[in-house]
């Protein structure tokens, strides 16, 4: 009799389910990355919840990106959720996110009545939130699955980490706020530049369903949020689907949509010199920390300038401030060939590049005092970093 009464109660509701708090909190955290407080569409300040036979799906969206996170009913023989009455609702994102994080018990019950009021209970706590009509929530982009390829999760995370830092922080040239992806048969080349530095990463890809060369520019802000969501399960593949104005990343229980930037990305190949007057091989960490120490004084300068002198394996890193003084230190390069080097550069730009190279040693190419500095990991031709010097000598 009690079971019949419960069934009648659930049937009178627009949506009813129980869900594990940790799974709900994780999904909310993911979709919140796509929710913006500044939007011309008020309903997009909320999170859409949809309960059905495949579990609970949460959606967050703004003008640039949309994220769907699904909590399956069961996963690896563990029960995540039970849906008593399928349905959907849109709840205020900030309040719902804070509330879920602070709920006291391991399980959460969500019931939505026909007035779109959501009763959320956990332990002895009960919240009643006014929801919004889910039918008013915009549909997510439709991306044709024909144009797609796959890449390992850990590799995708590395690509983002090693390129997105070099995108432009200003909207003067909007296309430079994104990373240019050039997809060819079996390979992907990713390039970012803000006109003062450049990063380029090439990788092999799998299951490329389009043999034609494709070029698309993904907003740096979208890739930064994607990197935060990707976990460290490197063996899992990410399916990447492209259209004329959208890109979709699918992995695990996540679907991550991003709009693409309009405009033609500049041809960066002409910025990369093919010859050099000098080159050296140094310990990556040693050079990084030497520049870091020199930057303590360089930070007082508007351009954060550090000077490098190199001749016959003798390396000197220095900087100075009229108010504070001068710092310099010396160390030995593993290899050095070519003309003596005297060059200045932004400490931040050089550290940004070196800090994203995982190799123990880097090979640095010098072309001239005002020509680009090229940095590559020793033994890896798939990564190239470029930093423009600053005129001081």
Language model features by range: what are they?
Residues 1-393:
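Structural preference for solvent-exposed beta-strand-turn elements
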């Amino acid at each position: 009799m009690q079971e019949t009464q419960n069934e009648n109660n659930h049937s009178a509701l627009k949506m009813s389910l129980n869900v594990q708090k940790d799974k709900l909190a994780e999904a909310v955290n993911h979709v919140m990355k796509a929710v913006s407080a500044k939007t011309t569409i008020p309903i997009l300040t909320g999170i859409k919840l949809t309960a059905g036979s495949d579990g609970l799906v949460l959606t967050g969206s703004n003008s640039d990106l949309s994220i769907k996170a699904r909590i399956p009913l069961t996963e690896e023989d563990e029960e995540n959720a039970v849906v008593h009455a399928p349905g959907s609702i849109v709840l205020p994102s900030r309040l719902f996110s804070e509330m879920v994080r602070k709920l006291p018990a391991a399980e959460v019950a969500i019931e939505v009545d026909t007035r779109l009021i959501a009763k959320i209970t956990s332990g002895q706590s009960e919240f009643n939130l006014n929801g919004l009509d889910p039918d008013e929530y915009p549909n997510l982009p439709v991306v044709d699955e024909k144009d797609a390829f796959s890449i390992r999760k850990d590799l995708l995370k590395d690509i983002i980490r090693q390129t997105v830092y070099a995108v432009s922080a200003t909207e003067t040239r909007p296309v430079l706020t994104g990373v240019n992806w050039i997809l060819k048969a079996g390979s992907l080349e990713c390039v970012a530049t803000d006109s003062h530095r450049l990063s380029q990463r090439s990788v092999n890809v799998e299951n490329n369903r389009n043999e034609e060369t494709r070029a698309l520019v993904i907003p740096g802000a979208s890739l930064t949020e994607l990197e935060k969501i990707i976990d460290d399960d490197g063996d899992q593949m990410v399916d990447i689907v492209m259209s004329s104005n959208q890109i979709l990343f699918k992995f695990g229980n996540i679907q991550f949509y991003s709009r693409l930037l309009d405009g033609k990305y500049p041809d960066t190949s002409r910025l990369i010199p093919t010859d050099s007057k000098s080159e050296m091989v140094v310990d990556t960490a040693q050079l990084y920390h030497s520049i870091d120490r020199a930057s303590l004084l360089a930070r007082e300068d508007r351009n954060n300038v550090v000077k490098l002198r190199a001749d016959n394996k003798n390396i000197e890193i220095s900087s100075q401030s009229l108010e504070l003084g001068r710092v310099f230190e010396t160390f030995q390069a593993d290899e050095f060939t070519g003309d003596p080097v005297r060059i200045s550069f932004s400490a931040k730009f050089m550290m940004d590049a070196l800090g994203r190279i995982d190799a123990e040693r880097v090979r640095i190419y010098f072309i001239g005092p005002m020509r680009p500095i090229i940095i590559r990991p020793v033994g890896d031709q798939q990564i190239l970093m470029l930093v423009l010097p600053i005129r001081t000598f």
